[in-house]
Amino acid sequence: VHTPYENLDLIPSSTLMSQIEYELFTMIQREYVLKKCLRSIYEKELYDYVLIDAPPTLGTWVINILCAADYVIVPVEASPWGLFGLANMFDFLNGISEMTEAKIMGVLITKVDERKNYYKQTREILAGYDNINVFETFIHVDTSVEWAQDNSVPVSVYKKSTRSAKEFQQLAREVMDYGSR
């Protein structure tokens, strides 16, 4: 779907996505269906970046996304449950490492509320992981993100001056810098 925003096209998710797991289950080489679908986009160089927001599950659709990816940004909530999910994701990635060449670009700490100690604890625990990049940028809890999601607009369109809009722009610069290494 072309959007009114420069350099931004979207394929929106819908309730039909829940059928994908079922349909993939019956396919041969089901882990590579998305990669095959994206091949022509890569070959034609239509986009500089294709970002896929994966659901917080570890099923066949997520395996498809990881098999199609060159890099993975792993979001982790600044909360006790966020770290639990991160450990599960690393175990999952190790388990499918023979299927995918995706590399972890970095861990992005999200939903940071500096009134709580979780951000600091999360950062300290992540520092203990060898060879895992933790993005310098982190994303604060911000009601403007919820408003933008609810109204289907980028947060930078809703309010360019919000903290979260600036944080997402800073993250984009970090991602582009990583890609130019």
Language model features with spans:
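C-terminal alpha-helix
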Residues: 170-181
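Active-site donor-binding loop signature of nucleotide-sugar glycosyltransferases
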Residues: 13, 137, 141, 160
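Active-site/binding-pocket entry motifs
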Residues: 16-17, 141-145
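Conserved catalytic-core segment of NTP-binding enzymes
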Residues: 39, 43-143
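C-terminal boundary of histidine-terminating zinc-finger modules
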Residues: 149-167
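Cytosolic-facing regulatory segments adjacent to core modules
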Residues: 1-58
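Short clusters of hydrophobic/aromatic residues that line enzyme substrate/ligand-binding pockets
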Residues: 24, 34, 145, 155-158
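Charged catalytic carboxylate motif
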Residues: 33, 85-88, 167
